[in-house]
Amino acid sequence: MKKASELIFIPIPGIGHIVSTVEIAKLLLCRDDNLFITILIMKFPFTADGSDVYIKSLAVDPSLKTQRIRFVNLPQEHFQGTGATGFFTFIDSHKSHVKDAVTRLMETKSETTRIAGFVIDMFCTGMIDLANEFGLPSYVFYTSGAADLGLMFHLQALRDEENKDCTEFKDSDAELVVSSFVNPLPAARVLPSVVFEKEGGNFFLNFAKRYRETKGILVNTFLELEPHAIQSLSSDGKILPVYPVGPILNVKSEGNQVSSEKSKQKSDILEWLDDQPPSSVVFLCFGSMGCFGEDQVKEIAHALEQGGIRFLWSLRQPSKEKIGFPSDYTDYKAVLPEGFLDRTTDLGKVIGWAPQLAILAHPAVGGFVSHCGWNSTLESIWYGVPIATWPFYAEQQVNAFELVKELKLAVEIDMGYRKDSGVIVSRENIEKGIKEVMEQESELRKRVKEMSQMSRKALEEDGSSYSSLGRFLDQIQTS
């Protein structure tokens, strides 16, 4: 009798990465009745981000093969340090807990089940050491795009093979020729900020170095979206197998992630959208960490009022703690221009938390001012909503560059904006970007609608991502 296989997934904490992990687990379980999955859950020690509510909701999710998936909560660790280095160290501090959890799993597994390997988040490469200790293969789940993955490999090779100090790119006018991009990359403008830090940059590039030790990389993208980047990775003899398996999205059960209070907020928002004409509303939302200072908030408000376009604006206040998530305002008037809410009462709606998927799916929404996180990008493409790019941190500037210059699926508000730069984006630039993204008969809108159809076909039987996922399943059976 053929043995069942079990995969151990290790995502980083944060709702975006956990949701993506569960969604790819669902796809795998639906494709192989002889597969079991365990997901090890790390938690941030500060403000909750909805992960607990989401995981509890999975018990009643009809699309989940609950008898073949389980969640193991790891003991909570303290977050010491700040910035990227503090975050990476926090992830690595869970190694002993992961080792204990896997040891218990191996002691209790039945003789008819074999552990087929670790599937680690893109920032969990320290867990490769544990996989090696247990004699198990490891795979990477890369939750960003293929072009960004190619950039990581490129920068790592510059450091390790050409002895290049990547921090020198910070104030340079260098343009990088990277095989996963068609156009040269303006380094100072779009490289992830962490690359410009000596310690954090080395941490970051070591991830790519360690990817090369694994058996393959699952990438949350699809062939039709990034054909050049995927081809460049596939033809590079130094890079292990890459499996484009996206878009990995939680499009069917977003409502399960929210409390009853947020469910009421969601209903109010959707009722307001129901009263708006088709494709007439621009949606502004900047992700789970997205927030601005008062000066920038006022520039956005002036742009919206002057532009006269219907808007739905997710406006959140910065955390009062050094490390933490943005929260909802108790009074928007404290930060908005005087009289703004009264003057725009028939034009738009200001909200706090936003049910992003439900909003993007609504026919009234015609454009999305976005931080260009990869999940948000894929969601916008899935629903055929053009993007105006306003990145904050991490790989978001790279994503914005790819969307605007490479894929022609977005317009620019400020592609090189960085959250901690102190730069204020002008109301004129904001208004211009919003008007461009909201053009009804534009070539951009046509391209995004076409890509939306391709994103859905990729996951259908015999679609590009469906086939790629099948190749991965074949790989774990033979490893």
From Swiss-Prot:
Active-site residues, record numbering mapped to chain: 17 (proton acceptor), 121 (charge relay)
| Protein name, UniProt field | UDP-glucose flavonoid 3-O-glucosyltransferase 6
Q: What family does the entry list?
A: Belongs to the UDP-glycosyltransferase family.
Q: Does the keyword Manganese apply?
A: no
Note down the stretches annotated as region Disordered. 454-479
Catalyzed reaction equations: a flavonol + UDP-alpha-D-glucose = a flavonol 3-O-beta-D-glucoside + UDP + H(+)
**Which tissues carry this protein?**
Strongly expressed in achenes, with lower expression levels detected in receptacles.
What are the GO MF terms of this UniProt record? flavonol 3-O-glucosyltransferase activity
Q: What induces it?
A: By de-achening. By injection with salicylic acid, with transcript levels increasing by a factor of 5-6 at 4 hours post-injection, remaining stable until 6 hours post-injection and falling below control levels at 8 hours post-injection. Down-regulated by synthetic auxin naphthaleneacetic acid (NAA).
| Keywords from the named record | Glycosyltransferase, Transferase
TM segment ranges: none
pH dependence per the entry: Optimum pH is 7.5-8.
Positions that bind an anthocyanidin: 17, 394
Q: State the superkingdom.
A: Eukaryota
Q: Does the keyword Transferase apply?
A: yes
Its function?
Broad spectrum multifunctional glucosyltransferase. Catalyzes the formation of flavonol 3-O-glucosides during fruit ripening. Accepted substrates include several flavonoids, hydroxycoumarins and beta-naphthols. Uses UDP-Glc as a sugar donor, but not UDP-Gal or UDP-GlcUA. May also be involved in detoxification of xenobiotics.
| Residues noted as binding UDP-alpha-D-glucose in the record, renumbered to the chain | 143, 354, 356, 371, 374-376, 379, 395-396
The EC number(s) given in the record are: 2.4.1.91
Temperature behavior is:
Optimum temperature is 35 degrees Celsius.
